[in-house]
Amino acid sequence: MSIEFSSEGTTIEYKKAKEKFPKSFWETYSSFSNTEGGYIYLGVSEGKSGYEITGIKNANDYIQIIVDQANDKEFTNFNNISMDNIEKNEYEGLEYLKIFIPEVSSENKPVHVRNNINNSYIRRNDSDHKMNNDEIRRYLRDANPKSDAELLNNYTIEDLDIKAVRRYKNLIQERNTEMDVLSMDNWEFLKQYGAVGKDRKDNKYKLKKGALLFFGKENSILEIFPNFHLDYRNKTHYTEDKRWLDRVSSGEVTTEEINLFNFYNIVLDKLVNTVLEGFVLNETTKVRKDTKMDVEVSLREALANLLIHSDYEDNSSIIVEAYKNNYIFTNPGEMLVTKEEFARGGESKPRNLTIVTLFRKAGFSERAGSGGMKIFRVAKENKLRMPEIESSEGKTKLKIWKIDLVDSYDDLKEEEKVILRFIVKENRKVKMKEIQALEGFTEYIAKTNVNNLISKAIVMKFGEGRSTRYGLKPNSSEMIANIEHTMRNMQESIVDRNR
């Protein structure tokens, strides 16, 4: 029986390596470390009928080379090799190695080789690409982020939108009715609530960078952050003639200064007004008031998350897009936690602590690390398509759906939709015989359409022979969200039994 290998891609690399250890191993080592991680196979190469084992001369010698060079601080800045992740295999007398290279944390990027930071690589599709200077600088910023608590010389309350400060004071007053916030002097208020700090060098109080972003006048913000750009587009009825129905964008003439506080409030109201767009009304999928409210919770968390975690030193825009069936939030800066940690909750590494503080004190964002968990929980509990996260190439994109999984695919045939609805309804892996038993189905119809769903990467085959089952193909963040959801249900049932 031959061994089947998946095609090369973002997380898989094959190297022939038969006669000598390949120098290109280290480019892939760097790119996997800096991107999503992956597997390097040594002794496997592409043949006429796919990938085949060609073997290596001495696996132990190769392992020693890998371990020695990974530990050499004059060769690479970070050892990302664990002996537990090196697997020696043999097939028909041929040895080959399978080495897992995990993605490293942001503080250790960029991983470079040959003692030169310019030898830093990222993975794009099935190849390793040397980073350009902008990409290297971006990773260095994430490794040692400049604090948005940095104090600004020569900036005063005159650089802030006083109307925004007053509205913020009103929010604080509503949340703290026992305090007389409204009568406080604006500058004293900003000191007390974290927007202003004391410079120990000259004992003067000065604006923090994050406060300028949060409350500032656009012209003042642009002096410090020349690439600052916020953009909201309503594309719920997108056509070639009409690219958006509504837009809010910094840099345009408006009655409001577009800082983070004003953008959040204006755009959240607009997003909430689009929630009912795209919901399907039928006997099995009813729009309930609590579903609408839950989706609004997701939008609030996603919008706050977008503004809190953006890299404002970058040269790309912060974009919010509302479509008929989903919302897309795009920000400069990769996630500083893994997708799994974001979905599970609990872990938080915000880039901008001052902005986090200002959002939280206004009630726009709750405890640290809970936003992603809420977003995934809303989708799970309301049977919506699970959120999708992409974080690479210096950007993070979060897509939130407001319809269920089946309706989110426009290109499915009716038989494929029936099968998918059945799997979703059963909430388990199903047998082919169960699919064949669906009304109007035959063995041929069932197998053909299941294979179509597998080829579209929507459904996955589990097991072999008589134990074969078919279920949804999960992504990693969805699996973590499912685990979190199950654990919470178990905890709630234990509490109920003990009441």
Place the predicted regions along the sequence by residue.
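A short, conserved structural fragment
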Residues: 196, 454-464
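Short, cationic-aromatic polyanion-contact patches
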Residues: 464-486
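Active-site helix-to-loop segments that bind/position phosphate- or nucleotide-bearing substrates
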Residues: 123-314, 322, 330, 336-348, ...
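Polybasic/polar functional segments that serve as interface/processing modules
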Residues: 1-40, 44-98, 105-107
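Intrinsically disordered, low-complexity regulatory tails
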Residues: 77-158, 314-317, 366-369, 377, ...
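Glycine-rich/acidic phosphate-handling loop/turn and adjacent ATP-lid/helix
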Residues: 327-363, 404-416
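Short acidic, hydrophobic short linear motifs in intrinsically disordered regions
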Residues: 426-438, 499
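Short amphipathic alpha-helical interaction segments
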Residues: 440-452
